[in-house]
A protein has these predicted regions:
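Tandem repeat scaffolds
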Residues: 2-242
Length: 242
């Protein structure tokens, strides 16, 4: 990995194009249109910043987001072993990409929201929104966070969801060995699998839910696949949690 890096520490409203082979460090800045040319940007980090990244074909492995607002869009993006933490709000939209061992933890206001409970989350809670299609997301992790996940044809094997409030829409995703612990899913969360003969349905049989609140339709599909349930509360379809 190259040791060269570029530091952006001023507000940039115009397009900024960065060549491959550099670590991009953005600190206390606003970068409205950051274009990363196809190639490697291992170890890039965004600290206390507001950044919009266009990352088609980029390797953003080991990316770090700390106390920032981050928007990342692209196809063929690698974000393996990335970490967004400490109050980072993010919007991620990826296709044909990889988020192996990618982790989100401690979104803004999540600690207070989780303490109050889903019915009293309040308006000061920031969240992470992740949309992914046809992507590898094994060992994906979300902890102590409020998030919205929309994933289609993704591999979420060995993923972990811990102390979260989530809106999830999983379409034909493999949740083999996925663990949901102390998780509340909104009543409009959806789980869809086109056939019982798919790897997604077989994988769901290996998922586990402990101390969770699940909407009825989500629960019924998971239990029909053989997912493990322990201390799970099922909410009716007309009940809004958050």
């Amino acid at each position: 990995m190259t040791s060269q890096h570029i530091i952006l520490n001023s507000h940039q409203r115009d397009k900024v194009v960065v060549r491959p082979g550099l670590q991009v460090h953005v600190e206390s800045s606003v970068v409205s249109h950051l274009v990363m040319a196809r190639g490697s940007f291992h170890g890039s980090r965004f600290v206390n910043s507001d950044v919009h990244v266009y990352a088609d074909g980029c390797d953003l492995s080991n990316i770090r987001g700390v106390s920032s607002q981050i928007d990342i869009r692209g196809e063929g993006v690698i974000m393996d072993s990335g970490l967004f933490r400490s109050g980072t709000v993010a919007n991620i939209e990826l296709t044909n990409s990889s988020m192996f061992d990618f982790e989100v933890r401690d979104t803004p206001g999540s600690s207070l929201a989780l303490h109050r409970g889903a019915n009293d989350a309040g308006g000061d809670v920031g969240s992470v929104s992740i949309s992914a299609a046809n992507s590898s997301c094994e060992m994906f992790k979300i902890e102590r966070s409020v998030a919205e996940l929309s994933m289609a044809d993704c591999d979420l094997t060995d993923s972990t969801f811990y102390r979260c409030m989530l809106v999830v829409k999983f379409a034909n995703c493999n949740l083999k060995n996925a663990e949901f612990v102390d998780v509340t899913l909104s009543q409009d969360s959806m789980l869809s699998i086109p056939s019982r003969s798919t790897a997604a349905f077989r994988g769901l049989s290996k998922a586990s839910f402990v101390d969770c609140v699940l909407p009825r339709r989500f629960y019924e599909l998971a239990i029909s696949a053989g997912a493990s349930m322990d201390h799970v509360e099922v909410i009716p379809e007309d009940m809004e949690l958050f």
